[in-house]
Amino acid sequence: MSQIGGATCTWRYLGRFVTLGIYASVALFVWYTLVPTRSKHKDSIAINNNNADPATALIPVHTKNVVIYAATKFFGHPITTERFLATCPDVQNYCRITQEESEFDNADAVLFHNADYRGSTDKFKKMKSQRKPGVPYVLWSLESPTNDMFRPDSHMINWTMTYRTDSDVWAPYGTIVKLKNPVEVDLNAIWEGKTKTATWLASNCITQNHRFDLIKKIIDNGFEIDIWGNCGKQVSQCAGVDNQESPCVLELIKPYKFYISMENSNCKDYVTEKFWKALNDRMTIPIVLARKYYKDLGVPDSAYIAVDDYATLDEFLAHVKKVNKEKDLFLSYHQWRKEWKVIIGSGFSGWCTLCNKLQDKDYILKNPKSYKDVAWWHSFEMCNNQIASKYL
C-alpha cells in the first residue's frame, strides 16, 4: 500500500557523491578560458573512450604543485584535501586545498562555493581588490538555479564548476557510456527480484516544479508508490543513515520496479544521483518528468519513462501499469544494460579535474576569460518548472 507520512530520513550534501567544478581568473587583469561545451570537454571524451570515473579520466603529466584556496566553506563545513580529493589520491601528491587566509597570496586558484558566498564581508572585498594575473576565481555549484541564486560582481568569476555540460570544469552527478563490446545481462533475474511497484526517497517535499503534487495525484489514480524520508515514512531499517550511498538504501530500493527520479527543479543538465543510482545498481526503471534533460545527456530513450511523453496523465498511468504487469515490456526497459554502462559521479571529482587544469599556467594566461554576468549563466531562464502543472 502506498505510504505518505511525515518522518525524517535526510541525506545531507556532505554525504552526497557528486563531482563539482570551479571558476577562476582575475578581475582587473586576466580572464581565462577553458572548454565551454561538452563536446570539447577533454575529461568527457576520456570518459567515453575509457569508461573511466570522471575523477580520474584525465590525469596529465605532473608539471607543478598546485594550491587551491577555498574562500568559503561547503554548506558550513570545512573544505579539505582529504575529503574533496579523496577520489583521486594520486592528485593529492601535487595538489592540495587550503582555507588558511595566509596562503591566499600564493594560491593557484580561488574557489567559492555559491551557497556559502557572502560578498559584502571584508574578506571577500580583499579578494576582489588583490587579485593576481593567472589565478582564476572559480564558482562551484551543485544546485540548480531554482535553488541557488549566486550574485557575484561582474567579471569576478573566471571559471564555473558545475553539473552543466558547458561548465569550464564539468562535474556531473553521473554519465553513461557505450560499451565497446556488448555484455551478457541476466534479465530474468532482474524481473524475479522485483516484488514491489514503485518508490521514492525524498527530503525536499515543497518544490517549485510541483513534483510532490504530481506524485500524490499518480497515487490517487491507483499507481502504488511507497514514499520514504521527509516526505513519507521513516526508513526504520536504515536508522542513522542519512545519505543515499548507504548499502541499506540500496537494499531498500532494489525490490521495486520503478523509482521516482523527478528532480526538485527542471533545469538544463540538472540530473542528480537519484536518477543515476536508480539506473545503475538499483536496477529500477526511473520515472522522470521530462525526457529532454536526459536525452541531452545521452541516456538511451529505452532506459527510463518520461511523464511528458504522454498527452494526459491517464495515458501515462495506462502505460506504467502495463509495464508493471507485463514481463517482456518491463524487460524492454533493461535491454540497454547490454550495451551501456552508468558511471556514478564520485562526489567531488570536479576538484580532481580542476587540479589537473591548473597544471598549465601558460594556457591559463594565454586564454583569458571572465563572466560579465554569471548570474545570467546560472539563471531561471535555464529552467522550466511548469511541466508537472499540465497533469495536475
From Swiss-Prot:
Thermal activity profile: Optimum temperature is 23 degrees Celsius. Very low activity at 37 degrees Celsius.
Cytoplasmic domain ranges by topology: 1-12
Pfam families linked to this entry: Glyco_tran_10_N, Glyco_transf_10
Protein origin, superkingdom: Eukaryota
Regulation: Inhibited by divalent metal cations.
Keyword Glycoprotein: yes
Transmembrane region(s): 13-35
Ranges facing Lumenal side: 36-392
Protein's membrane topology: Single-pass type II membrane protein
Gene disruption phenotype: No visible phenotype. Loss of several tetra-fucosylated N-glycans. Loss of tetra- and tri-fucosylated N-glycans in a fut-8 or fut-1 mutant background. fut-1, fut-6 and fut-8 triple mutants lack all N-glycan core fucose with only one fucose present in the bisecting galactose, thus resulting in the loss of tetra-, tri- and bi-fucosylated N-glycans.
Enzyme Commission designation: 2.4.1.-
The protein's enzyme class: transferase
A GO molecular-function descriptor: fucosyltransferase activity
Family affiliation: Belongs to the glycosyltransferase 10 family.
PANTHER family named in the record: ALPHA-(1,3)-FUCOSYLTRANSFERASE C-RELATED (PTHR48438:SF1)
Protein name as catalogued: Alpha-(1,3)-fucosyltransferase fut-6
Species annotation: Caenorhabditis elegans
Gene that produces this protein: fut-6
